[in-house]
Regions:
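Terminal, low-structured helical/coil segments at or just beyond the last alpha-helical repeat
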Residues: 175, 181-206
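Alpha-helical linker/edge segments of TPR/alpha-solenoid repeat scaffolds
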Residues: 64, 79-86, 141, 170-175, ...
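Register position in tetratricopeptide repeats
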Residues: 98, 132, 166-167, 196-203
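N-terminal leader/linker segments that initiate helical-solenoid repeat arrays
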Residues: 1-87
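Alpha-helical adaptor scaffolds
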Residues: 83-156
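TPR-repeat structural position
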Residues: 64-67, 102, 136, 170
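Residue-level signature of tetratricopeptide-repeat
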Residues: 126-127, 133, 160, 167, ...
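Alpha-solenoid helical repeat scaffolds
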Residues: 56-57, 72, 110, 144, ...
């Protein structure tokens, strides 16, 4: 995961203990949170990238039973921004989505993408929020940011295919699903979509 850029913090000493979850309250400025730990070193980022390469190689294997663990490890790495304050915004946005509160989720996640524009998972989660809010244009734009930062983000490719299919762009939707399956061939949703779209487009190619 590309770490979030360092952000200035207030001079006040951080409070003891973890910050309380804001629930469905209005998003708070990340600058009011306790100072984030120092960013990962270049060596740590390189090691993380090497770990991801190994996990993606394992994920791409069509057989075997270890792909699920590889998927879990990839998602865990992607969920870390490198900043405690940004991670808190991410968790608050995620909690709001789980509660069905897309307005609050978008508030938290917009603050996250503003302060940590290199954190791909922030863009991805905001894309999901836009999609659930019925706003496909911004949702697709956010997926573009995700794929710019992490071209192997299979979740973003599958989500892009879903949105394009809803918009009637079946050919590009099919291509997005196919690209996603090249990275993660075990996604049932993408497999079903490829079969459905190939059958639908078969007649138009005749």
């Amino acid at each position: 995961m590309i770490p979030a850029p360092a952000i200035p913090v207030q001079d006040e000493a951080p409070q003891e203990g973890p910050p309380e979850d804001g629930g469905d309250a209005a998003p708070e400025s990340p600058l009011s949170e306790p100072a984030a730990p120092s960013e990962p070193t270049a060596e740590a980022r390189l090691r993380e990238r090497e770990d991801l390469d190994l996990l993606f190689a394992e994920l791409a294997q069509p057989g075997g039973e270890t792909w699920a663990r590889a998927e879990t490890d990839i998602l865990r790495i992607w969920s870390r921004s490198g900043s405690a304050a940004m991670d808190l915004l991410y968790k608050r946005g995620e909690a709001a989505l789980d509660a069905g509160d897309t307005v609050t989720a978008l508030g938290h996640l917009t603050a996250l993408t503003d302060h940590a524009p290199d954190f791909a998972s922030g863009w991805y989660l905001r894309s999901v929020a836009f999609y659930l809010d019925g706003d496909l244009g911004p949702a697709i734009a956010d997926l573009g940011e995700v794929l710019r930062l992490e071209p192997r983000h299979f979740g973003a490719l599958t989500q892009l295919g879903t949105m394009l299919e809803e918009l009637g762009d079946d050919r590009n939707a099919l291509e997005a699903f196919r690209q996603s399956l090249k990275i993660h061939p075990h996604q049932q949703e993408a497999q079903d979509a490829v079969r459905r779209l190939e059958q639908k487009l078969q007649g138009t190619d005749a």
